[in-house]
Amino acid sequence: MKEKVVLAYSGGLDTSIIIPWLKENYDLDVIAVCVNVGQGDDMDYVKTKAIKSGASKIYVEDVKEEFVVDYLYKAIKSEALYEQDYMLGTSFARPLMAKKLVEIAHKEQAKYICHGCTGKGNDQVRFEVGVKAQDPIIKIIAPWRIWDIKSREDAIDYAKKVGVEVPVTKKKIYSVDKNLWHVSHEGGDLEDLKNEHKEDMYFMVTPPEKAKNEPTYLEIYFEKGAPVKINGEVLNPVDIIDKLNTIGGENGIGIADIIENRLVGMKSRGIYETPAGTLLYAAHKKLESVTLDKYTYQYKKIVSAQYGELVYNGLWFTSLREAIDAFVDKTQENVTGTVQLKLYKGNIKPCSVDTEYALYDEGISSFGESELYSHKDAEGFINLFGLPSKIKALKNF
């Protein structure tokens, strides 16, 4: 009886040719696993293609709701970003995929897990660190680090040689990652920084200049930091993301052209479409500015950056990530209320906030006197606050 390998399978170029390659070079029984995080593929086609390519079995795991509730809601509450711009669409999906791969490997008593990540990317780290955190014994096969195929063009040639159908041509080659949260585009002519990215690559977003000529007003209601209602309508978590992707996309919201510092040491360029995430972060940020006290608000920004880096670097299964989640959850206890946004041709303008937990007080913040604040108190405060500067000036050095 042949030993088994569980393959993270998408039906794309890399994983399509890995099936025959594993059988040819390792003589393994290949079990394909497609983790459905909302990439929008025809799963019946993916199943058929995996079997035709030589897999003995194919699992399709629909984890969209788990992805939103256990991963993306953490992103929203923390407002995690990598290097201030990247909304971590790929990074948040990988630990969930790694979790499912390990579960099925245990179920099938597989000795190996295989992935199609390149030897230059971050995903190889995310997958393998995620797998090892759950099963330190299972062995990893990473074809891109060991086979003779050195480019995507080589991969296409190999696919033709072994008779695997691949929906990519040499004329237009982008590496695309899609899920509920985002679409990323890398490779091809994007690797030359002198090239402006082409708007015809977009899947989710209408180019801003071609978006609607009338503004769209949008209301998002949050409960303890998590979105619950869109325009007054209660929706399930997956439908919330889908609806906001549609609304944001048709208004040209959510395009980012980013140069990022990869974990493995090089810089890379990616074009990202994240309409729902962009809307949710903007609304959540506005609500937090009203409901969090100054020091919690400021410290959370530091923690959010650290959280983004942890997730980007594949360190999901760590005590620090769990501790940050606990801190973030504490900060979200009063982040409840409705934020109205005005959307127009790629721009987002927060219009209003309605929350019973507002720390903003119109009476205190106005220019008039109030019982809690007297203009006369400011003089003593300024004297004490400026005392270090005054002493330094008196010392004259």
Curated annotation (Swiss-Prot):
SUPFAM superfamilies to which the protein is assigned, alphabetical: Adenine nucleotide alpha hydrolases-like (SSF52402), Argininosuccinate synthetase, C-terminal domain (SSF69864)
A GO term, aspect molecular function: ATP binding
EC number: 6.3.4.5
Record field: catalytic activity: L-citrulline + L-aspartate + ATP = 2-(N(omega)-L-arginino)succinate + AMP + diphosphate + H(+)
GO BP term, pick one: urea cycle
SUBUNIT field: Homotetramer.
Protein name: Argininosuccinate synthase
Gene: argG
